Amino acid sequence: MTTTTTAADFRHALRVRATSAAVREAVTTEQGVSGWWFPTTAVGVDRLHVRMGDSGLELRVRAEGDDVVWDVLDCPVEPDWVGTRVRFAARPDGEGGTALAFTHHGLAALPCLEVCTAGWSWYLPSLASYAETGAGAPGPRPR
């Protein structure tokens, strides 16, 4: 597992012992995102509403080649996220698993960098666990 930040992006790489199709399902469906991050509701064909406590965020989910991209459309809980993009690049690793390259474009330039880095560093292993076993660690992360 590797985490890096550049001038504008937060990146995290990890190996998932599941197929890239399982990883894709985990980041594109209501059930998938709810299983590793926060309770999620599908809104139309390409949108997800993710509930975080009394607030939440709206995502447009789209494919860009083999990657899945979340465009953050609204985020009252973390307004600086609006306009950022989250990319999940899942590729077969040649050993029956998946190499997942995660990028939150624009995050490193935001005031929430420290808190958000800790959050993604907690939730990405939860995503891997969900894809591997069907059980992640959704909801508020331990402090």
Predicted features by range, described:
Residues 19, 50-53, 115:
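Alpha-helical scaffold segments that form or flank carboxylate-/histidine-based iron centers
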Residues 34-43, 48-101, 105:
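Hydrophobic-ligand binding "helix-grip"
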Residues 1-42:
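Hydrophobic ligand-binding cavity/cleft-lining segments
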Residues 24-27, 36-37, 70-72, 117-120:
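Tryptophan-centric aromatic hotspots in well-structured domains and transmembrane helices
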Residues 105-143:
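A conserved amphipathic terminal alpha-helix motif
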